[in-house]
């Protein structure tokens, strides 16, 4: 199949590089699709391939993506980063144009967010109606944030989220950014506690504010967690920053989500972690394996969220009247 043979769909191409690309209506539709009975979803990828390009290793993202494609009738093709040499052996634009000849959707976990932007731009400029989905970059992790939103809806109820608060303790990284965006779109307040030098950049706070949200920033974990309905944390050292491990352990001393810190949260508060978890560092074993932890529910929701997102980028919407 060549680009010329691709039939343009009757909807605009829906790239999702971060959660704000969905907008409020798109987010509502993706979550509704994610909550649908899988067998009720039409096989929108029947006879089609979906490219899964990974520059970084993955457990939850790869498995949830592959199974979501299969559930929608498609064929997932896993591509390791070294096979294409993104922006080294071949430009991101050329990689995107090539993969779009064979696949109806391109999903990529990349080292640099700019690679995704160049892929999406190249397809748009060429008039190729193939969406790009961010499976993780150094800037954002929208697929994780969708699973987080799904988990919060299940725990507290879809109609009871507005006005609740999520406290994020740790490095204000890609996970934090996407969580803050989805929280703003859901009407959930968000606080973040990070050591000096590891807090959110001003542009992230400005984006959250532009979406109608507000993020409270502090360097005191207890201040962030006090009265919060959900407490979220992530590893102190993200993939690709391993050489900073010792420095970060020192900087994040006192930022472990343990029983003492959790006692400051609301009585019905739950604990979230995007995994993998380093017990004894960013979270204690007692908490991550305890009764208030919903991390396995959260992990399971990666599949449901991905299924909803993949269906949405292919033009499927969900509303009171069903699918359309």
Describe each model-derived feature in a short phrase.
Residues 115-137, 243-265, 291:
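A short, gly/pro- and small-residue-rich
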Residues 45-153, 279:
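Phosphate/diphosphate ligand-binding glycine-rich loop within oxidoreductases
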Residues 209-286:
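Rossmann-like adenosine-cofactor binding region
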Residues 44-50, 161-164, 268:
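Phosphate-coordination loops involved in phosphoryl transfer and adenosine-cofactor binding
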Residues 268-269, 274-324:
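Adenosine-phosphate binding glycine-rich loop
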Residues 1-67:
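Positively charged, low-complexity intrinsically disordered leader regions
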Residues 55-67, 154-233:
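Glycine-rich phosphate/diphosphate-binding loop of Rossmann-like nucleotide-binding domains
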């Amino acid at each position: 199949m060549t680009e010329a043979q691709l039939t343009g769909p009757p909807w605009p191409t829906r790239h999702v590089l971060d959660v704000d690309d969905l907008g409020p209506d798109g987010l509502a539709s993706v979550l509704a699709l994610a909550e649908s009975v899988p067998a009720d979803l039409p096989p929108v990828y029947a006879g089609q391939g979906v490219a899964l390009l990974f520059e970084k290793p993955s457990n939850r993202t790869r498995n949830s993506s592959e199974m979501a494609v299969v559930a929608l009738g498609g064929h997932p093709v896993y591509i390791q980063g070294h096979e294409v040499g993104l922006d080294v052996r071949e430009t991101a634009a050329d990689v995107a144009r090539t993969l779009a000849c064979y696949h109806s959707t391109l999903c990529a976990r990349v080292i640099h967010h700019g690679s995704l932007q160049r892929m999406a731009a190249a397809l748009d400029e060429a008039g190729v109606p193939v969406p790009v989905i961010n499976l993780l970059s150094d800037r954002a992790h929208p697929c994780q944030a969708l699973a987080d939103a799904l988990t919060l809806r299940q725990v507290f109820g879809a109609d009871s989220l507005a006005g609740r608060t999520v406290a994020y303790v740790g490095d204000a990284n890609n996970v934090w950014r996407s969580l803050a965006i989805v929280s703003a779109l859901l009407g959930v307040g968000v606080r973040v506690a990070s050591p000096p030098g590891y807090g959110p950049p001003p542009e992230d706070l400005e984006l959250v504010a532009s979406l109608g949200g507000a993020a409270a920033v502090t360097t005191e974990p207890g201040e962030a967690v006090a009265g919060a309905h959900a407490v979220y944390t992530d590893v102190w050292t993200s993939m690709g920053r391993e050489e900073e491990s010792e420095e970060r352990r020192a900087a994040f001393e006192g930022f472990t989500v343990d029983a003492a810190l959790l006692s400051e949260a609301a009585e019905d508060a739950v604990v979230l972690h995007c995994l993998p978890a380093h017990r004894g560092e960013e979270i204690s074993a007692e908490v991550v394996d305890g009764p208030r932890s919903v991390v396995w529910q959260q992990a399971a929701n990666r599949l449901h969220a991905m299924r909803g997102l993949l269906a949405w980028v292919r033009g499927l919407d969900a509303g009171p009247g069903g699918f359309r």
